[in-house]
Amino acid sequence: GFGFVTNSMEYFSAYSQYVIATFLILFGVNFSLYYLILIGKCKEAFKSEELRTYLMIIVISVFIICFNVISNQIDNLQSLGVMDLEEIFRHSYFQVASIITTTGYSTTNYEYWPELSKCIILILMLLGAMAGSTGGGIKISRLVISFKGIFTRIRKLINPRYVSKTKFEGKILEETTTNDVFAFITLYFFLTFIIILILSCTLH
C-alpha cells in the first residue's frame, strides 16, 4: 500500500488504474497455477475451483458496488468526483482488486460510498486472495473448504448414514483437514475481534 504521492492511485490516469488493478488481481492468483500454464497444462490450471471462486467473487462484488453506488448515491456523485458510468466501474473495479489482494491502494474515498458497498469491502478485506499468492486474508481455498465442510455436516445431521466426503479441487479431504480450516477461521475472527476491542479501548 505504499506510494510516493499523497492521493494514492487517484494521481494516475484511468488507463494506469485499469492496468494496475488487473495486475493486482493476477498477483492474487495461486502461483502454482502459473507454473501449470508455463508447462503447458492450461486446462488443468483453469479448472481450479479456487480460481473460479476467486474470479466470481471479484465480478459479483464489482457489479454489486457499481449498482449500489449508482442507485443510492446519485445526488453525491459529483462530490465524489465520479461523473459517469465508466468512472463508477473503474473505481469499483480498482477498489475490489486492491482490497481482496490486501494491497491498500485506492482511487477514490470510498468512505462516502453506500453502506452495502462498504460492507462488501469489509468482507473482501477478511477473505483475501488465493492461497499461494501475495495476498493476505483467510484465503479463498479455506472459504470454499469451510462452506463445503458445513454442507457435508448438515447432510450428516439429516442422514446419519451419509458417508461424509468433502471434496476440493477434485480430491477428497480428510476430516482433520476441514477441522483445521474451521479452527483457523475461528482463530482468525477471534483475534480480529480482540484487536478491534483493544483499538476501540485505546481510541479517544
Describe the role of every protein-language-model region:
Residues F2-H204:
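Membrane-proximal intracellular helices of multi-pass ion channels
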